[in-house]
Amino acid sequence: MCSSDLKRVVHHAWRLNFNNVIHSLKHGYYQGWDLHPSQLPLRYAAVYSFFLDGLASTSLRLKSFMGKAAQATLIGDVFDDAATGQALLNYFLQGISCGAILEKDAEKTGLTLDEIRTRSFKKILQGRQS
């Protein structure tokens, strides 16, 4: 096998691994089981890509949802109800935890840092209702 063939095979493997990580993240699997050290840079890139690519739309979803006092909302073709509130918050908690999202970026959701740090959508709603 010549070096250009090897390069093509390696790049294909990288793309495949990157796409598999993105697929898992989109379906809620935030933990990975990388078996080889060469997979770690790809996971790092995929995790950052996932959080940064979704930052604007997820910020808008959570801000809109909170603005309507957690009533069911429809943005485009995405329907959010109370059951998704914690999942939207978790997106920001995970993104902040890994360093892909800055706390100041999370404030675009309309939540304060103190609210985000409660880690509980239920507590945020209770705090806003009192």
What are the language-model segments listed below?
Residues 1-130:
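Expand to "…catalyze enediolate/carbanion chemistry for C-C bond making/breaking, isomerization
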